[in-house]
């Protein structure tokens, strides 16, 4: 993947920042996306550059189709983006009986509508190169469901269906489309939500995964060696499912 342009949405977060650094170390020219956390994205870019990698940042609201398209059109002036990693997403948990329409809509707008808003404008330039990799970071909740996360699980399950369909559409063009569905991964939010003894009870491996482990899987999926893998939802969850 040397010198290929890679866009990482949500590139300032716990997984996104490590993923951006991994793709840069693989030789990609990484574009780190953020919306509200622009300063954090810039820090990721600076770290990549300090290590000898190539990186830049971009800021736009994934839920705004017109704003997203405008930002992507500017990026495409420098050539096609052949690797897309969708990592942006939010939680807004509540039992459905107490969930507001805003909670339902906002989570789906970012995780699912954002996938369309980013991917669609980049497809024709990618198809023109006859090589591409699209990987979305989903969640175990999208596979199994989870209490209090009907909105989040619906968004991620929708991402699975969209990715499987897109994989079929693009298979003859040298473009693969896959999903990585992590379980519990080390992050400030995970530490705040789960005590160590809870993790030992939930996860057969008795630990959380790391962003580096998720990034290693994505690194493989965007590589030449993974060219025959497409339309798959791949779990990375320590045996939880």
Predicted features and spans:
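Alpha-helical segment proximal to the catalytic Tyr-Lys
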Residues: 124, 168-169, 227
């Amino acid at each position: 993947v040397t010198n290929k342009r890679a866009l990482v949405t949500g590139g300032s977060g716990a997984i996104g920042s490590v993923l951006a650094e991994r793709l840069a170390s693989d030789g990609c020219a990484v574009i780190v996306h953020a919306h509200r956390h622009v300063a954090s994205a810039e820090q990721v870019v600076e770290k990549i550059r300090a290590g000898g990698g190539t990186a830049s940042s971009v800021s736009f609201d994934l839920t705004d189709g017109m704003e997203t398209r405008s930002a992507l059109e500017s990026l495409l002036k420098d050539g096609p983006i052949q690797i897309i990693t969708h990592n942006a997403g939010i939680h807004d948990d509540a039992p459905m009986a107490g969930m507001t329409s805003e909670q339902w809509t906002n989570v789906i707008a970012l995780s699912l509508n954002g996938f369309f808003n980013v991917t669609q404008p980049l497809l024709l330039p990618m198809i023109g190169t006859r090589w591409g990799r699209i990987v979305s970071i989903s969640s175990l909740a999208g596979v199994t469901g989870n209490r209090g996360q009907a909105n989040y699980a619906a968004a991620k399950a929708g991402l699975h269906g969209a990715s499987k369909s897109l994989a079929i559409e693009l298979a003859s063009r040298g473009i693969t489309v896959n999903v990585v569905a992590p379980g519990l991964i080390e992050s400030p939010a995970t530490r705040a939500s789960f005590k160590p003894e809870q993790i030992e009870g939930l996860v057969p491996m008795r630990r959380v995964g790391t962003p580096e482990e998720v990034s290693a899987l994505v690194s493989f999926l965007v590589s030449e060696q993974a060219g025959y893998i497409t339309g798959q939802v791949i779990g990375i969850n320590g045996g939880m499912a």
